[in-house]
Design a protein with these regions (language model features):
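Non-catalytic, conserved peripheral segments adjacent to functional cores
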Residues: 1-103, 122-124, 129-178
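Conserved metal-binding segment of the jelly-roll/cupin
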Residues: 101-122
Length: 178
């Protein structure tokens, strides 16, 4: 397990060694001891798995209380994954980072205090992630995916959105972390 820094404080791309031969491959997809060395985090409580069709955009989601750290990975297909730092005390507050995730064994560590979302680039994509806290619907928030102030470069897309994601708050209006 190796970490590659991103442009946002405390967020990392994480790679794992993959061993391939004529039979297939072996990949240790997660190792808590190694992950804790990189991030200091050792308290995952939930695993989630979603499947999305091409053009679906999910997010940008976060919990204002019981903030969730997320270790995300795309296991089939391809997504454009975006995170936004909502921690007022962070030097990268209000900045975003985007990366394409696919079957290339990259994980993205999304620390607590970030909004997270992704856009499906292929016919379908399966996305798995671990969280450091449970889902609490009463604290669930959505940051508007196409907020002008943030200026996230999604490319020229017409996404399929849930009603919840259509009604996201602008960066100026959204709840933030102290």
């Amino acid at each position: 397990m190796n970490a590659i820094g991103t442009s946002l404080k405390d967020a990392y791309l994480i790679t794992n060694n993959k061993f391939e031969d004529e039979r297939g491959f072996f990949l240790e997809s997660f190792n808590l001891r190694e992950f804790e060395k990189i991030t200091g985090v050792s308290n995952f409580v939930q695993d989630n798995h979603s499947k999305s069709s091409k053009g679906v955009l999910r997010g940008l989601h976060y919990q204002i209380q019981h903030a969730q750290g997320k270790l995300v990975r795309c296991i089939s297909g391809s997504v454009y994954d975006v995170i936004v730092d909502l921690r007022k005390s962070s030097p990268t507050f209000g900045k975003w980072y985007g990366v394409e995730l696919n079957r290339n064994n990259l994980h993205l560590w999304v620390p607590p205090g970030f909004a997270h979302g992704f856009y499906t680039l292929t016919d379908t994509a399966e996305f798995v992630y671990k969280t450091t806290d449970y889902y609490h619907p009463e604290y669930d928030r959505t940051l508007l995916w196409n907020d002008e102030e943030l200026g996230i470069n999604w490319g020229d897309i017409q996404p399929v959105l849930s009603l919840k994601d259509q009604d996201g708050k602008s960066f100026v209006e959204c709840d933030k972390y102290e």
